[in-house]
UniProtKB/Swiss-Prot annotation:
GO cellular component: peroxisomal matrix
EC id: 3.4.21.53
Keywords linked to the UniProt accession: ATP-binding, Hydrolase, Nucleotide-binding, Peroxisome, Protease, Serine protease
Species of the source: Candida dubliniensis (strain CD36 / ATCC MYA-646 / CBS 7987 / NCPF 3949 / NRRL Y-17841)
Protein name from the UniProt record: Lon protease homolog 2, peroxisomal
Record SUPFAM superfamilies: P-loop containing nucleoside triphosphate hydrolases (SSF52540), Ribosomal protein S5 domain 2-like (SSF54211)
Location in the cell: Peroxisome matrix
Lineage of origin: Eukaryota, Fungi, Dikarya, Ascomycota, Saccharomycotina
Pfam families the UniProt entry points to: AAA, Lon_C, Lon_lid, LON_substr_bdg
GO biological process, one term: protein quality control for misfolded or incompletely synthesized proteins
Catalytic activity: Hydrolysis of proteins in presence of ATP
C-alpha cells in the first residue's frame, strides 16, 4: 500500500494566503484551464501580440516575441485603430473582458501593482516548491533575482462563460448568474510562430478568486487598469482524511477504467468485424443471421450466436461514437489517459510512494482534465474552491460517467438482442434506412446552416495536440513550416464563382488552408487580374476533385497542383510593410538619422533615398486630400481599410497547429482565432451580397490604400564601387531606414534563366524563381531586395563562349529592373503576372562595364569610390573599432539600450584606446592599397584579440596591470612587420626615360607606376651602318594590348614632331635631320616594374610618350611629377577615369608633389570637391559651385578653390594639359625644348 504524508499547515495558515494584483485575460473559446495541466492555445497574431505587449518591459531578450511585437505599432496611441479591422477590434475588446463600447483598443503595459503582484506570486510559488512555506510581502519583494523572462508572463485566465452551455437549459452559463469569481492563474511557458498564427503553451498553476469588496481592492483602485484584478490565492493544501478520500478516488477511477477498457474492446471488435465484413465476396450488408435454411446442428448454432455477438450495433450509437472519438481520437489524448491510469496503479502498488496533499489534489484536477467530461462539469470543478467540496464533486462525476458506460452497455445489449433475434427483415431494413436518412439530414443541416449559425457554434479543437504527461518543464516547440491562409473581408464578384467551392471538413489541414485561401482571400487580392484568379480557381477544382481519393485518385498532376496552390497561397498578397503608419507620416529626420548612424559619408546615396521618401510623403498628403473630396459613404468606409504602407497589415488567420508533441500534460489545442474566423465568414457572406448589387464599390477601400504607393515607382539603384566600401551594408541600412523587410539575392555565377524566372511546372521538382522566393521569405510585397554582384551574372558581356542552352539570365533581369514592366512580371512557375513595382531593388557591382548596355541603362548608377585615409580614420574610430571591441568579448555598455545616454558614457576606452597616429599607421603600413575597409577591420580585430588575451590574464591575476593603450610601437608586436613600401620603384635620382604614371587598380585603389625606357643607338655598335630603318620598340612588364597600342601611338607622335621640326637638339640649326637620323637608328626598350601584375588601359599614353621623348632628347624627367591621360596621333590629351583614386595613390607616394591630369577631367575634380564638402558635414556654397562650373568653361580659368583644396588635403599641386605640348612645358618649363613657341597652342594650368 502507498504511504500517506498528511502535512500539517496549521501553523502556517496565515502565511499561505495572499492577495496580489495580476493581469487578466478572457478566452474566446470554451476552454476551462485546470491547475497542473499545460494547454496549447492558438491565437491570432494580433491578439497574441496585444497580450504579450503588456509584458514588453520584461521580455526584451526573447527574440520570437520581439519579432512578433515589431509587426504592430502599439506605441502610437489610438491612431493604431485605423490599421485594424472591425473584427479584430471586437476581438480585443472581448479578450480584455470589456463591452464593445470600450474604446481603449491599444493594449498597455502592466501597472506597477501588477508587477509587484507577479513578484509576490512567484515568491510564494517558489517557496511552496522548496517547502519553505509563504513569506511576507517585504521579504518577497526583496528576492527577485530568480525571476526569468517567461516567469513574468503570469496572468489570471477568466473562463468564457458565454461559450459554455448548460445541457439542461441549452443556454450559456454566462446568461445566468455567475457561479463564482474563480479564475485560473497560469503562465505562458512556450511560444510557437507558424507564420500565420501564434500558439501559446499555458501552464495552469493554481486557482484564484477575484476580490471585489476588499480593502486591498480599494487600496489599488486608482492604480489598477481595466484588465487587472486583485486575486486571492490560498496555498493551503491540507486535505482532511487524505487516506479515505484517496482510496475512494482510486476505487472509483479503477472502476471507471475497467468500464472504459471494456467499452473500447467492444467498440473495436464491432468496428473490425464491420470492416472485415465489408471485404467479403458479396460485398453486401447481411441483415439476417444466416441463409434461409436453418441448421439445427449445435455447431451451427454456436457459429450463429458468435455472428450475432460480432455483428454489434455499437458503432451506430451516437453516444458510443462520441465517447470513442474523445477517448482515442487523439494519440496524445490516448497516451495521457494510459499514463494517468499507470500513475494510479503505481501509487497503489508502490509502498514507498508517498501521497501528500498536493499530489492528491493534482490527481483530482488531472482526472477531470483528461477524462471526457463536458466543459460545464470542468467549470464546476474549477469553481470548487474548497478542498472537501472538490473531492466530493470529482467522485460524483466519475460515478456519473461510470453510469453512462453501464447504461450504454445495457441499451446496446437490448438493441442487439432485438435486432438480431426478434426484428423482421423489414424492421431491420427500416432501422438502417432511418439511420441513413438521419445522417443525410444532419449533413445537409451542417452544410446549409453553417454560415448562419457559425457564430453560435462552440469551437472545437483546431487539431489534436493531445494530452501527455508533465514533468513540470516544457520548452517551446518548433513552428509549422507550412503557413496557412489569411482571411480578409471583401469580395470581387467578377473574379469567379467562389460560392461553388464547398468546404470539406474531412480533408487534411493543408487542403483546408488552401480552401480558405481560395474562398476568402483570393477574391480580395487587388493585384491579381480576373484571368489570373480564374486560372487559380480552375487548378483548385482539379485538386478538389482528386482530394478524396487515395494518392489523388490516380491523377498524376494532383501533387504538382497541390504544391503549386500552396506556393500561391504563401505569397503575401496585398501585404505592404513599412516603419511608418502611413505615407504622410514619414519622418524624414528619423530616416536621415538612421542612415547617418549606420554609414559615414555617402551623402549622394543618402540624398537619393531621402528624395524617394519625400515623394512618398507628398503622395500620401495628396491622396488624403483627394480622399476628402469623395462622397461620404466612401470616406467612411476608407477609415476602416488598412493602409498599404502601414505596419504589417493585420491578418485574420485560420487555425493551425504544430504537430510536435510536448512532453507534458497537454490538453488538445483550443483555437482562439475562432471568433475572428466566424466573424470573417459572416462579413464575407455580407460582402458577397453587396458585390452582386453594386460591384463597383466593393474594392474601393482596399484599392485606395494601395493607390498611394502605386503612384510612385520604387527606385532601382545600382551601387557601383570597389569591394569593401559598404555597398551591401548600405542596402541593409536602407531597408532599416524605410522600415521594410530585407532580402538578399546573390547573383554571382548564375547561368540559368530559370533561377530568375522560375522553372515551368512540367519539370520534376519545379520551384518559383529567386524573386518570388524572396517575396515569400519577406512576407510582404514591398521589401528591399538586394541583387548582389549583378555584374557577375553569366550572360551578356560575361558569356565568354558559354552556350545559351539555359537562356541568358542577364536578359531575364531586363524585365525585373524596368519600372515600366515589372508590375506585370511573369514567373514561369506561377504563370500569371506579379506586381513587383513596390519592391525597391538595389544592385551592387564592382565592374559595371561588364554588364550589357540595355541592363546598365535600366539602373540608376551611384558611384561609391574608394576611401582616403582620412575617411578610413573616421570610419575606424566611429564604427569599426567599437564593433570589434564588442565582438571580441569586452563588456562594453550598449548606449543604444540606455534610457538616458550621457556624453562619453560608453566604456570602450577602458578596454582599448588607439590614437589617430597609430590608426593612421595601421591604414598606411598594414592595409596599403585597399579601397575599402575590410582589411582595415581585420587588422583592428587582430589588435582587439591580442588585447582580449591580456585582459583575461589580468582578470585571472596572471599580470598585475592591464594597459588599454595601443601605440605605434606596439603594432609590430601585434601585427608583425608592415608591408613593404610601394615607393621602392619610384625612389632614386632623376633619370632619363624614367616617368611616373598613375593607375587605377582592379580593387578600386590607385597607385603610382614607373615607366622605364632605355635607348640604344645602332650606329655606335655598327660604325659602318650608314642609314637606319626606323626606331624599334620592345615593351615588357605583362602589358595589355590597349596599353601597347598607346605606346606605339606615342612613339609615332614623337616622330611626327620631328618631321614638323618642332623640337630643339644640341642648339644646332640642323635639328630635323639630326633628330631624324637618331630616331631611325634607335632601339627603345620600355619596361614597367612589378611584372607579375597585369597592366592595361589607355591612360598611360602620355607617360610613355614623354618617356620616349626623354630618351630621344636625352633629357631627364623630374621624379616628383606623376601624370595620366590618353594620347592621340595629333597629340591631344583625352580624359580618363578614376581621377580621385589616382590622386590618392599619388598622395600615398611621398616622392610625388605634382600631378598632371587631362584638362577635361577638371569637371570630375569639381564634382569630387563638392561631394567631399558635403560628406565632411560642411555647408556647400551652391553659388560657388555654379561659378566654378562657369569658370571651367573658359580656357584660362581663374578660380582656384578646387586646386587649393586638394593642395591642402593631399599636398599635391595639380596641372592640366589639353595637348602634349602642355606636358612638355610643365615638365621642362625652365628649358627651351620647343623650337617654335607659337606651336604651343595652350598654356599650362597650374596653381
Amino acid at each position: 500500500m502507498a504511504k500517506y504524508n498528511n502535512n500539517n499547515y496549521a501553523n502556517k495558515a496565515t502565511n499561505l494566503k495572499q492577495q496580489v494584483v495580476l493581469p487578466t485575460y478572457t478566452l474566446d473559446s470554451n476552454l476551462v484551464l485546470l491547475p497542473g495541466i499545460m494547454y496549447n492555445v492558438t491565437f491570432s497574431r494580433f491578439k497574441a501580440a496585444a497580450l504579450l505587449y503588456r509584458y514588453k518591459n520584461f521580455i526584451s531578450q526573447v527574440s520570437i516575441i520581439n519579432n512578433l511585437l515589431s509587426e504592430y505599432d502599439f506605441n502610437s496611441g489610438n491612431s493604431n485603430e485605423e490599421e485594424r479591422s472591425e473584427t479584430e477590434q471586437k476581438i480585443e475588446q472581448s479578450s480584455l473582458g470589456q463591452p464593445e463600447t470600450y474604446h481603449e483598443i491599444n493594449p498597455s503595459v502592466i501597472s506597477t501593482e501588477a508587477v509587484e503582484g507577479i513578484k509576490e506570486f512567484f515568491q510564494y510559488e517558489t517557496n511552496m516548491k522548496t517547502g519553505r512555506g509563504g513569506k511576507g510581502e517585504k521579504e518577497a519583494k526583496s528576492t527577485n533575482d530568480g525571476i526569468k523572462e517567461f516567469d513574468w508572463l503570469t496572468l489570471a485566465i477568466i473562463p468564457n462563460l458565454d461559450k459554455i452551455k448548460d445541457p439542461e437549459t441549452n443556454y450559456s452559463i454566462g446568461d445566468a448568474a455567475k457561479l463564482t469569481n474563480v479564475v485560473t492563474v497560469a503562465r505562458i511557458i512556450g511560444i510557437v510562430d507558424d507564420s500565420t498564427n501564434i500558439k501559446l503553451t499555458l501552464q495552469a498553476i493554481t486557482r484564484g478568486v477575484q476580490i471585489t469588496d476588499d480593502s486591498k481592492m480599494n487600496q489599488h483602485k486608482n492604480g489598477l487598469k481595466t484588465n487587472e484584478q486583485v486575486i486571492g490565492i490560498d496555498w493551503n493544501h491540507n486535505v482532511s482524511d487524505l487516506k479515505g478520500k484517496f482510496n475512494a478516488l482510486q476505487k472509483n477511477y479503477q472502476q471507471l477504467f475497467q468500464s472504459i477498457d471494456k467499452f473500447l474492446i467492444d467498440y473495436r471488435e464491432a468496428l473490425d468485424y464491420n470492416k472485415n465484413n465489408s471485404n467479403n465476396k458479396n460485398g453486401n450488408l447481411s441483415l439476417i443471421k444466416g441463409n434461409a435454411t436453418i441448421n439445427n446442428n449445435k455447431n451451427s448454432d454456436d457459429k450463429s450466436n458468435q455472428d450475432i455477438k460480432s455483428q454489434n450495433l455499437l458503432t451506430l450509437n451516437p453516444l458510443a461514437n462520441a465517447l470513442y472519438m474523445q477517448l482515442v481520437g487523439s494519440k496524445d489524448f490516448n497516451k495521457a489517459f494510459h499514463r494517468l491510469e499507470k500513475l494510479f496503479s503505481q501509487v497503489s502498488k508502490n509502498d514507498e510512494y508517498k501521497i501528500d496533499n498536493e499530489t492528491y489534489l493534482r490527481l483530482v484536477d488531472l482526472t477531470c482534465g483528461i477524462l471526457p467530461f463536458p466543459n460545464f462539469q470542468k467549470l464546476a470543478l474549477l469553481n470548487k474552491y474548497k478542498l472537501d467540496d472538490r473531492s466530493v464533486l470529482i467522485n460524483e462525476m466519475i460515478l456519473q460517467l461510470i453510469q453512462i458506460f453501464e447504461n450504454l452497455q445495457t441499451n446496446n445489449s437490448f438493441v442487439n438482442n432485438w435486432f438480431h433475434s426478434e426484428a423482421t427483415n423489414i424492421q431491420k431494413a427500416n432501422v438502417v434506412a432511418n439511420q441513413l436518412k438521419s445522417i443525410r439530414n444532419l449533413l445537409e443541416g451542417m452544410t446549409k446552416n453553417r454560415p448562419i449559425k457559425s457564430n453560435k457554434r462552440n469551437p472545437g479543437p483546431a487539431s489534436s495536440s493531445g494530452p501527455s504527461f508533465s514533468n513540470g518543464k516544457s520548452s517551446p516547440g518548433r513552428a509549422n513550416a507550412r503557413p496557412k491562409s489569411n482571411h480578409q473581408d471583401g469580395f470581387n464578384g467578377n473574379d469567379g464563382d467562389y460560392n461553388d467551392v464547398d468546404d470539406d471538413d474531412d480533408g487534411d489541414e493543408d487542403l483546408k488552408a488552401i480552401f480558405n485561401f481560395i474562398k476568402h482571400k483570393l477574391p480580395t487580392i487587388s493585384t491579381l487580374s480576373a484571368d489570373s484568379k480564374r486560372l487559380i480557381l480552375k487548378d483548385f477544382k482539379r485538386v478538389k476533385a482528386s482530394a478524396n481519393s487515395p494518392g489523388g485518385g490516380g491523377n498524376s498532376d494532383f501533387h504538382v497542383l497541390r504544391n503549386y496552390l500552396e506556393i500561391v497561397m504563401d505569397i503575401p498578397w496585398d501585404n505592404y510593410v513599412t516603419k511608418f503608419k502611413s505615407n504622410k507620416d514619414i519622418d524624414l529626420k528619423l530616416a536621415k538619422k538612421q542612415l547617418d548612424d549606420d554609414h559615414y559619408g555617402l551623402e549622394h546615396v543618402k540624398k537619393r533615398l531621402i528624395q524617394y521618401l519625400v515623394v512618398l510623403k507628398l503622395l500620401g498628403i495628396n491622396a488624403e486630400k483627394d480622399q476628402s473630396d469623395k462622397s461620404q459613404p466612401i470616406k467612411d468606409n476608407s477609415k476602416d481599410s488598412p493602409n498599404s504602407s502601414s505596419k504589417a497589415l493585420t491578418k485574420s488567420p485560420t487555425s493551425s497547429l504544430s504537430r510536435k508533441t510536448i512532453s507534458s500534460i497537454v490538453i488538445a489545442n483550443k483555437d482562439e482565432t475562432y471568433l475572428a474566423k466566424q466573424q470573417a465568414k459572416t462579413t464575407n457572406q455580407k460582402s458577397i451580397t453587396e458585390a452582386k448589387t453594386n460591384p463597383s464599390t466593393t474594392m474601393i477601400t482596399s484599392n485606395e490604400s494601395i493607390h498611394v504607393s502605386k503612384n510612385n515607382k520604387s527606385p532601382i539603384i545600382m551601387l557601383a564601387g570597389p569591394p569593401g566600401t559598404g555597398k551591401t551594408s548600405l542596402a541593409k541600412s536602407i531597408a532599416s531606414a524605410l522600415g521594410r523587410n530585407f532580402q538578399r539575392i546573390s547573383l554571382g555565377g548564375i547561368k540559368d534563366e530559370s533561377e530568375i524566372r522560375g522553372h515551368r511546372r512540367t519539370y520534376v521538382g519545379a520551384m518559383p524563381g529567386l524573386l518570388i522566393q524572396a517575396l515569400r521569405k519577406s512576407r510582404c510585397m514591398n521589401p528591399v531586395i538586394l541583387l548582389d554582384e549583378i555584374d557577375k551574372v553569366i550572360g551578356g558581356n560575361n558569356s565568354g563562349g558559354v552556350n545559351k542552352f539555359n537562356g541568358d539570365p542577364s536578359a531575364a533581369l531586363l524585365e525585373v529592373l524596368d519600372p515600366e514592366q515589372n508590375n506585370t512580371f511573369i514567373d514561369h512557375y506561377l504563370g500569371f503576372p506579379i506586381d513587383l513595382s513596390q519592391v525597391i531593388f538595389i544592385c551592387t557591382a564592382n565592374d559595371p562595364w561588364n554588364m550589357t548596355r540595355p541592363l546598365l541603362d535600366r539602373l540608376e548608377t551611384i558611384e561609391i569610390g574608394a576611401y582616403d585615409y582620412n575617411e578610413k580614420l573616421i570610419i575606424g574610430k566611429k564604427y569599426l573599432l567599437p564593433r570589434q571591441i564588442k565582438r571580441n568579448g569586452f563588456p562594453v555598455v550598449d548606449t543604444k539600450k540606455m534610457t538616458t545616454v550621457v556624453a562619453g558614457s560608453s566604456n570602450q576606452d577602458e578596454f582599448i584606446r588607439i590614437n589617430d597616429a597609430t590608426m593612421k599607421k595601421v591604414i598606411l603600413d598594414y592595409t596599403r592599397g585597399e579601397a575599402g575597409v575590410r582589411n582595415f577591420e581585420r587588422r583592428l580585430g587582430t589588435l582587439c584579440r591580442f588585447k582580449a588575451v591580456e585582459y583575461c590574464e589580468w582578470l585571472n591575476k596572471d599580470i598585475k596591470n592591464y594597459n588599454p593603450i595601443i601605440d605605434e610601437n606596439d603594432l609590430p608586436i601585434y601585427l608583425g612587420v608592415p608591408y613593404s613600401s610601394g615607393d621602392v620603384t619610384t625612389e632614386g635620382t632623376v633619370g632619363v626615360g624614367v616617368v611616373h604614371g598613375l593607375s587605377y587598380n582592379s580593387d578600386g585603389s590607385g597607385s603610382v607606376l614607373v615607366f622605364e625606357s632605355i635607348g640604344f643607338d645602332r650606329r655606335i655598335s655598327n660604325k659602318e651602318h650608314n642609314g637606319g630603318n626606323g626606331a624599334t620598340l620592345n615593351m615588357t612588364g605583362r602589358l595589355g594590348e590597349v596599353l601597347m597600342e598607346s605606346g606605339k601611338i606615342g612613339l609615332v607622335f614623337i616622330k611626327s614632331m620631328i618631321y614638323k621640326n618642332i623640337l630643339k637638339f644640341d642648339n644646332n640649326n640642323n635639328n630635323k635631320h639630326l633628330l631624324l637620323d637618331k630616331y631611325n637608328n634607335l632601339d627603345i626598350h620600355m619596361h614597367v616594374p612589378m611584372g607579375s601584375v597585369s597592366k592595361d588601359g589607355p591612360s598611360a599614353g602620355v607617360t610613355m610618350a614623354l618617356s620616349f621623348l626623354s630618351v630621344l632628347l636625352d633629357k631627364p624627367v623630374p621624379s616628383d611629377i606623376a601624370m595620366t591621360g590618353e594620347i592621340t596621333l595629333r597629340g591631344i590629351i583625352l580624359p580618363i577615369g578614376g581621377v580621385k583614386e589616382k590622386l590618392m595613390g599619388a598622395h600615398l607616394n611621398s616622392n610625388i608633389k605634382r600631378m598632371i591630369v587631362p584638362r577635361e577631367n577638371r569637371k570630375d575634380l569639381i564634382k569630387e570637391y563638392s561631394r567631399s564638402i558635403e560628406e565632411a558635414g560642411e555647408v556647400l556654397d551652391h553659388h560657388l559651385i555654379n561659378d566654378l562650373i562657369k569658370d571651367n568653361e573658359d580656357k584660362e580659368f581663374k578660380l582656384t578653390q578646387v586646386e587649393e583644396y586638394y593642395q591642402n588635403k593631399y599636398g599635391i599641386s595639380l596641372f592640366y594639359a589639353k595637348e602634349f605640348y602642355d606636358i612638355i612645358k610643365i615638365v621642362w618649363n625652365e628649358d627651351e625644348v620647343l623650337l617654335k613657341q607659337d606651336n604651343s597652342r595652350l598654356l599650362e594650368y597650374h596653381i
